[in-house]
């Protein structure tokens, strides 16, 4: 069998989704209630990085980009993550704040997609979280000019050791180029795998102070 033939075998990789369905009668009025339940179950199932989410943005040419970051907080105002403000994603959000998020809980045969608008967090919010991080992570935030080209990993490691020595006394200061974003909750879609590819999808859309719920075809 040639390498090409082996690659073509991916077309036959599939499985049935058998972990149960999602019914309209079981849905809460508030999508955050269901999100919290699903996130809790993802944690209880000991999934690797249950708070990992794909963040999708677009650049000024409408070219989409995606990357995985960690959810650090959520409430009725939105979902929060932190990043280097000089990063590609931060620049893209500055140009176009429309963002989508995806939580891929494959083991539970579930996905959650969020669509909303990103806004910068206040310095107070950022500082509070920054100083809750492990000290080495705080120093690491100073090291990297995110998304810039570098010639070798050793540059980062040397810079880390240099800054660790510099900041050995007292608190590590908050970098001016480090911050966070809150993604507003405009649409939230819940996907539960189903047998025979008859998956269950429910879309919550915000309408004024309430949520409209629709079942979508798989």
From Swiss-Prot:
A GO biological process held by the record: pyridoxine biosynthetic process
Family as reported in the entry's similarity comment: Belongs to the pyridoxamine 5'-phosphate oxidase family.
EC number: 1.4.3.5
Top-tier EC class: oxidoreductase
Cofactor(s) for this UniProt protein: FMN
Function: Catalyzes the oxidation of either pyridoxine 5'-phosphate (PNP) or pyridoxamine 5'-phosphate (PMP) into pyridoxal 5'-phosphate (PLP).
HAMAP family per record: PdxH (MF_01629)
Oligomer status and interactors: Homodimer.
Reaction equations catalysed: pyridoxamine 5'-phosphate + O2 + H2O = pyridoxal 5'-phosphate + H2O2 + NH4(+); pyridoxine 5'-phosphate + O2 = pyridoxal 5'-phosphate + H2O2
Record has DNA repair as a keyword: no
NCBIfam families reported for this sequence: pdxH, PRK05679.1
Cofactor: binding comment: Binds 1 FMN per subunit.
Residues given in the record as FMN binding sites: 67-72, 82-83, 88-89, 111, 146-147, 191, 201
Residues given in the record as substrate binding sites: 14-17, 72, 129, 133, 137, 197-199
UniProt-recorded Gene Ontology molecular function terms: FMN binding; pyridoxamine phosphate oxidase activity
Name of this protein: Pyridoxine/pyridoxamine 5'-phosphate oxidase
Entry keywords, A to Z: Flavoprotein, FMN, Oxidoreductase, Pyridoxine biosynthesis
Species annotation: Escherichia coli O139:H28 (strain E24377A / ETEC)
Biological or metabolic pathway of the protein: Cofactor metabolism; pyridoxal 5'-phosphate salvage; pyridoxal 5'-phosphate from pyridoxamine 5'-phosphate: step 1/1; Cofactor metabolism; pyridoxal 5'-phosphate salvage; pyridoxal 5'-phosphate from pyridoxine 5'-phosphate: step 1/1
Record PROSITE patterns: PYRIDOX_OXIDASE
Pfam families named in the record: PNP_phzG_C, PNPOx_N
Superkingdom to which the source organism belongs: Bacteria
């Amino acid at each position: 069998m040639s390498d090409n033939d082996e690659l073509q075998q991916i077309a036959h990789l599939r499985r049935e989704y058998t972990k149960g369905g999602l019914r309209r009668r079981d849905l809460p009025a508030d999508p955050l209630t269901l999100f919290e339940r699903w996130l809790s179950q993802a944690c209880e199932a000991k999934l690797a990085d249950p708070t990992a989410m794909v963040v999708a943005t677009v650049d000024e040419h409408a070219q989409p980009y995606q990357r995985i970051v960690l959810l650090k907080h959520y409430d009725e105002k939105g979902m929060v993550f932190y990043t280097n403000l000089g990063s590609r994603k931060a620049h893209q959000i500055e140009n176009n704040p429309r963002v989508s998020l995806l939580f891929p809980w494959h083991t539970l045969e579930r996905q959650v997609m969020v669509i909303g608008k990103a806004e910068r967090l206040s310095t107070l919010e950022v500082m509070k979280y920054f100083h809750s991080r492990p000290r080495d992570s705080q120093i690491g935030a100073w090291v990297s000019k995110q998304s810039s080209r570098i010639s070798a990993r050793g540059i980062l490691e040397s810079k880390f050791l240099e800054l660790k020595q510099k900041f050995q006394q007292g608190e590590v200061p908050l970098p001016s180029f480090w911050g966070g974003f809150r993604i507003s909750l405009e649409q939230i879609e819940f996907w539960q795998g189903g047998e025979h590819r008859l998956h269950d999808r429910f879309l919550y859309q915000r309408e004024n102070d309430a949520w409209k719920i629709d079942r979508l075809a798989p």
